[in-house]
Amino acid sequence: MSKIIQAFNSSNRNYTPIWFMRQAGRYLPEYQMLRKTTNSFFELCYDPIKAAEVTLQPIARFDFDAAIIFSDILVLPDSLGINIRFINNLGPTAEKIPNLLDLQKLKIQNTKISKVYEAIDIVRKKLNKQKSLIGFCGGPWTVLTYILGYNSRNTPKFQEIKSNNKHELILDSINILTKHTIDHLENQILAGADIVQIFDSWAGILPYQEFSEYVIKPTSNIVKTLKEKFPHIKIIGFPKGAGKLYHKYTKETNVDGISCDYNLPLNEMLKLQKNALVQGNLNPNTILSEDSKIIEESVIKIMDTLSNNRFIFNLGHGILPETPIKNVELIVKLVKNYHSSE
C-alpha cells in the first residue's frame, strides 16, 4: 500500500505524503531538454515513452510520494476531434465549437487518447510500489468552458455563457462530457492509476444553483460510477475557487479527497477533514520567494494545522515555471522531517 493510500485510510499519521500539481513540467531542466525533442506539447503528451519519462522526472529528483501522469485535461476534447492548439505563455487552447449541438455527434478517436493509457502502463511498471500513480481529468463543466472558446487569458464569464447558451443545452453538453470523462478515467485506472483527480478549474465562477447542477451533480455521477467498478480507487476533487461551497461539494459528491486552492483558509480545510482527506493549499507564488524563512513559515503553519489528520501536502494550484528547484527541495525536506509540537 502506498503512503498516499495510507493517508486516505488514516493508517500512518506519523508521515505526511507530498506531491505537487504540475510537478512534471517547465521548471525542471530535464523536462526542458526532453520538450525540445518534440514539435508540440501535445506531441509529447501522445508519445507514451516520453510522457512516461517526464512523469517520472520529479520522482527521481524529489522523491515525491506520487507520480501524476504527464497529460492535459484537453486531451479529451482533442480526442473528440475538437482542434486544440498550444499557445506559448497561454497553454493548450481549444478552437471554439460552432454549436454545442455538434458535441453530440463527436466520437472518441481511440488512437489518440489510448497513448495516455500506454504511458500510464509504462509508468506503473517502473514506479516503486510505495508510490501512487495519479490519473486525472478536467471536470465536465471546466472542459465545456474550453470548448466554448475560453482559456486562462480569456477567462470564462458565467453570465456570458448563460446568455449565449440555453440552460438545457449546457446540461446536455455536460452530460455528454461526463460520460466521456468516466470512460477516460476508467481507462486510466485499468492502465494502472490507483488515484484519480478531477480538476474543475472554473467551478468558482458559478452561482450556487449552477454549481450544484454543473459541478456537483456530474462529479457525483463520476464518483458513483467509478466506485461501483473500482471500490478501492481513491478519487480527489478540485473545485478551484469554490469558497464556502467546498463543504457542499465534499459532502454531496462523496469524493475521498478534496484539493483546496490557496484562497481557502486553513480553518476551513480543518473542517473539511471531518468528511474527507484534504490536500493543498500552499500558494505557488510563495515558493518563488528568495527568502527561505517565508517558505518555511508557510509550510510549518500548514503542517501544524492539518497534518494530524487525513492530509496530503500539495500546492493550491499548479507549480509555476519560474519556481527555483532549491525551494522545492526545501519544502520536501521540511514536510518529510516535520515533527508535530503536540
Swiss-Prot record:
UniProt entry keywords in alphabetical sequence: Cytoplasm, Decarboxylase, Lyase, Porphyrin biosynthesis
Cellular compartments annotated: Cytoplasm
PROSITE patterns cross-referenced by the UniProt entry: UROD_1 (PS00906)
Positions of substrate binding: 22-26, 42, 72, 146, 201, 317
BP-aspect Gene Ontology terms: protoporphyrinogen IX biosynthetic process
Cellular component terms (Gene Ontology): cytosol
UniProt-listed InterPro entries: UROD/MetE-like_sf, Uroporphyrinogen_deCO2ase_HemE, Uroporphyrinogen_deCOase
Marked site positions, Transition state stabilizer: 72
Keyword Ion transport tagged: no
GO molecular function, one term: uroporphyrinogen decarboxylase activity
Highest taxon of source: Bacteria
Xref: Pfam families: URO-D
Chief localization: cytoplasm
Coiled-coil region(s): none
Catalytic activity: uroporphyrinogen III + 4 H(+) = coproporphyrinogen III + 4 CO2
Recorded metabolic or biological pathway in which this protein acts: Porphyrin-containing compound metabolism; protoporphyrin-IX biosynthesis; coproporphyrinogen-III from 5-aminolevulinate: step 4/4
Listed EC numbers: 4.1.1.37
Assembly and interaction partners: Homodimer.
Family: Belongs to the uroporphyrinogen decarboxylase family.
Function per UniProt: Catalyzes the decarboxylation of four acetate groups of uroporphyrinogen-III to yield coproporphyrinogen-III.
Record-given protein name: Uroporphyrinogen decarboxylase
Source organism of this protein record: Orientia tsutsugamushi (strain Ikeda)
This protein's encoding gene: hemE
